A protein has these predicted regions:
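Internal alpha-helical scaffold of NAD(P)-dependent oxidoreductase catalytic cores
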Residues: 20-108
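Long, positively charged, glycine-interspersed low-complexity recognition regions
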Residues: 163-169
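Interdomain hinge/lid region at the active-site interface
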Residues: 92-160
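Rossmann-like NAD(P)(H) cofactor-binding subdomain of soluble oxidoreductases
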Residues: 1-16
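Short, flexible, solvent-exposed loop/turn segments with mixed acidic/basic and small polar residues
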Residues: 17-22, 119
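Alpha-helix N-cap/loop-to-helix initiation residues
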Residues: 11, 36-37, 128
Length: 169
């Protein structure tokens, strides 16, 4: 056994959701390789590199913290936004006719299976709660600025958030 987590996927699951080249140049995380047979680790590394994937080694704690930030909170945010809009949709049937690519990309993850995600949230609960608290804090900052009509600071926060462009292309 070699503990590994390919860091690529879509909102769909099962064989019918297969996408050619999904894993190309994405990372897979290997954890606790020192507890695995060295030959098995070498085989797994060769397999992932042949896809071709990049390999990162993390301890399980770091893996769980990082995935809470870059994956799990994105899913919760998408689920929450979808529920927010679906509750409004009950009163205004035409709302989805107005939705375009920005909305679609933001709620794409809400199509993910609860069969997959509830166990992930259960297993990584403490880290997800920490990240969710920080996310709620950020949302509260934006809310407070809107209430105060402090659009200069609102602008600055958006500019600060835009710096993610330099990290993620």
């Amino acid at each position: 056994f070699v503990s590994s987590h390919p860091m690529a996927g879509t909102e769909y699951s099962g064989p019918e959701a297969a996408i050619p080249n999904l894993f190309d140049q994405k990372y897979t995380v290997l954890c606790e390789t020192e507890r695995s047979d060295p030959d098995a680790v070498e085989l797994v590394e060769r397999m992932f590199r042949s896809i071709p994937m990049k390999i990162a080694r993390l301890d399980p704690t770091s893996h769980d913290v990082h995935t809470a930030y870059i994956s799990h909170i994105s899913h919760i945010s998408s689920f929450a936004l979808a529920l927010t809009v679906l509750s409004k949709e009950k009163d205004e049937g035409r709302i989805f006719e107005l939705a375009s690519s920005g909305f679609s990309s933001t709620v794409r993850l809400a199509k993910s299976s609860p069969d997959m995600w509830v166990p992930i949230f259960r297993q990584n609960r403490d880290n997800v709660l920490d990240v969710l608290d920080e996310h709620i804090n950020q949302l509260s900052r934006f809310r407070s600025l809107l209430i105060k009509k402090d659009f200069d600071t609102f602008y600055q926060l958006i500019q600060e958030a835009n710096s993610i462009r330099k990290i993620i292309s």
